[in-house]
């Protein structure tokens, strides 16, 4: 799924609940430069085998909400891997209202 939607500048919404991702190991830059994307619900994806989420949401400047409640990958402990400079992104763009994870 690496680069799958990369550069889809007009992509505003996508539902991925029918995707079988049980064997996917690379989701790097999957939504890179999806500048119109506002909400992303990845809670239905099976991510147990994913080992690369670098830049997953890089340059998604309109993104306001991300739901990754069922993401099952140790990489979530490092949010800077899928949202580079995660603190800077929130402060610079101020558009992200929330990231829901399974971790507390």
Regions found by a protein language model. Give the residues of each.
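Negatively charged
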Residues: 2-104
């Amino acid at each position: 799924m690496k680069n799958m939607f990369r550069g889809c500048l007009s992509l505003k919404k996508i539902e991925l609940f029918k995707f079988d991702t049980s064997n996917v190991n690379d989701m790097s830059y999957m939504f890179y430069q999806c500048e119109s994307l506002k909400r992303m619900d990845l809670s239905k994806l099976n991510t147990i085998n994913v080992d690369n989420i670098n830049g997953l949401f890089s340059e998604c400047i309109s993104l306001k909400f991300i739901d990754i409640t069922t993401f099952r990958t140790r990489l979530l402990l490092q949010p800077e891997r899928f949202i580079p400079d995660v603190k800077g992104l929130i402060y610079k763009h101020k558009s992200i209202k929330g990231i829901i994870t399974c971790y507390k």
